[in-house]
């Protein structure tokens, strides 16, 4: 089960909800967050039964990050939360970076470099259409293949087999042993036909 939002960490008693879900035997329980409250909540989340966490972080550049996500907190706050999650024992930690041509594509290498060798797994995601809320433009899409080729040219990569059927990210290991990176081709190679997931809203539908 993956808890998502909006921002799930602003939900009252999120730790209580996680604790109730954690009582289900053999459940892999994870959560996706923007990281704004993670520094103060990481230990409580782990204690409640959360196994791992994914943090949305589209750039290490404050101006770009805040503009893309319409937030008023800096990248440093997110990085503090990631460090707190690691210290609390949430593992693995994954970073989701949505890449938009002409917006943050020039900052991809900086973000990848920052997390290489830390155990944190960066996943580069094609900018996709989510309805009329993000003013989607195909010209803004940087394909997963182009991203992979660019990363491979700087840090050689080796493919990693999927860990389960229907895994959406193509996984690669750094040839020098500095960890793993993933690429999600949500536009150029749609995977909806093989989806193994169901989404449940907060209203239960």
Specify the residue positions occupied by each region the protein language model found:
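Auxiliary Fe-S-binding modules of radical SAM enzymes
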Residues: 110-117, 123-205
